[in-house]
Swiss-Prot record:
The keyword Acyltransferase applies. This is Chalcone synthase 7. GO terms for biological process: flavonoid biosynthetic process; polyketide biosynthetic process. Pathway: Secondary metabolite biosynthesis; flavonoid biosynthesis. InterPro entries: Chalcone/stilbene_synt_C, Chalcone/stilbene_synt_N, Chalcone/stilbene_synthase_AS, Polyketide_synthase_type-III, Thiolase-like. PROSITE patterns: CHALCONE_SYNTH (PS00441). The active site is at C164. Its EC number is 2.3.1.74. One of its GO terms (molecular function) is acyltransferase activity, transferring groups other than amino-acyl groups. Belongs to the thiolase-like superfamily. Chalcone/stilbene synthases family. Pfam families: Chal_sti_synt_C, Chal_sti_synt_N. The gene is CHS7. The primary product of this enzyme is 4,2',4',6'-tetrahydroxychalcone (also termed naringenin-chalcone or chalcone) which can under specific conditions spontaneously isomerize into naringenin.
Length: 389
């Protein structure tokens, strides 16, 4: 008779969960940040709000963003004028877009990740799909399973309405699945489309304008599995340790509410302060067991909620400017793509590490950290171990 302990032992992988491939995708519509205020106020029929437009121009100029990608273009917005108002019933129109476009963009990223992985998609055992928009049943996980032609018995996990911390959440979940299911190969997809949050300006709700200045569309996919097959699968990063915490005294710092008018975002001004105040504790818990206290000695992947968050974290920890380079480069080129951002940064870092002749996927360093920050205020922490190039 086989014991439960023996069954449990046989079910577990031997090594740590490892990222084996990364793919990214964006809609074709590329938006120039320097001219976006003119476009935004024109398309929302708000050119008469001259002071607010100047304020928005300053927000965009300070955002450190050069370009973003958006599914919404002028043609779509002209067909849906209610989406251009600040508070007009428009959820049906928004939902009709995102329930189609979210899995579609996710598929683009997934196809690239599967191609890099180089294994038949029939070997995918689990699917995690994450998006802040487009609640539907069956969900985007089901749609993607059908569109990719995955096996009908792939084990699916659908995560809706998570927000900007969720790039860390999906890696935490993928790690647990890969390490506790021998031979598991987890396809993780984060797909974010801002059609659910786009709205016209309001001079009484400036926090809504912050979102309009920062958010962009993008999807990223990774394959996660333990015990990579030598000469067949190419490991990129090992997922060593994960944590999630709610920052103390942070209730209401970042809120989102899905209503007839779409998804509305509300931000407290001191989000950067809350993040920087709690970053020390998160890092200590993560790296004290490794005897690491010099945070310039590790590589950094931080969700780029906005430049102020990155500036305050750098200042608080005394980080060298180059530590956040990959993070700032992704923010500059794509804007804040919510949950997908940290996966884009992982992709950027492994590519630049190879191009610049570094010895590891982590800019030549062995250990690294990945942070997600979002509604709650929730902080996700992932300790990464790089791989030799």
């Amino acid at each position: 008779m086989v014991s439960v302990a023996e069954i449990r032992q046989a079910q577990r992988a031997e090594g740590p969960a490892t990222i084996l491939a990364i793919g990214t995708a964006n809609p074709p519509n590329r938006v120039d940040q320097s001219t976006y205020p003119d476009y935004y106020f024109r398309i929302t029929n708000s050119d008469h709000m001259t002071e607010l437009k100047e304020k928005f121009q300053r927000m965009c100029d300070k955002s450190m963003i050069k370009t973003r990608y958006m599914y919404l273009n002028e043609e779509i917005l002209k067909e849906n004028p209610n989406m251009c108002a600040y508070m007009a019933p428009s959820l049906d129109a928004r939902q009709d877009m995102v329930v189609v476009e979210v899995p579609k963009l996710g598929k683009e990223a997934a196809v690239k990740a599967i191609k890099e992985w180089g294994q038949p998609k029939s070997k995918i055992t689990h699917l995690i799909f994450c998006t802040t928009s487009g609640v539907d049943m069956p969900g985007a996980d089901y749609q993607l399973t059908k569109q990719l032609g995955l096996r009908p018995y792939v084990k699916r996990y659908m995560m809706y309405q998570q927000g900007c911390f969720a790039g860390g959440t999906v890696l935490r979940l993928a790690k647990d699945l890969a390490e506790n299911n021998k031979g598991a190969r987890v396809l993780v997809v984060c797909s974010e489309i801002t059609a659910v949050t786009f709205r016209g300006p309001s001079d009484t709700h400036l926090d809504s304008l912050v979102g309009q200045a920062l958010f962009g569309d993008g999807a990223a996919a990774v394959i996660v599995g333990s015990d990579p097959i030598p000469q067949v699968e190419k490991p990129l990063y090992e997922l060593v340790w994960t944590a999630q915490t709610i920052a103390p005294d942070s209730e209401g710092a970042i809120d989102g509410h899905l209503r007839e008018v779409g998804l509305t975002f509300h931000l407290l001004k001191d989000v950067p302060g809350i993040v920087s105040k709690n970053i020390d504790k998160a890092l200590f818990e993560a790296f004290n067991p490794l005897n690491i206290s010099d945070y310039n000695s590790i590589f950094w992947i931080a969700h780029p909620g906005g430049p102020a968050i990155l500036d305050q974290v750098e200042q608080k920890l005394g980080l060298k400017p180059e530590k956040m380079k990959a993070t700032r480069d992704v923010l500059s080129e794509y804007g804040n793509m919510s949950s997908a951002c940290v996966l884009f940064i992982l992709d950027e870092m492994r590519r630049k590490s190879a191009e610049n002749g570094h010895k590891t996927t982590g800019e030549g360093l062995e250990w690294g950290v990945l942070f997600g920050f979002g509604p709650g205020l929730t902080i996700e922490t992932v300790v990464l171990h790089s791989v030799a190039i």
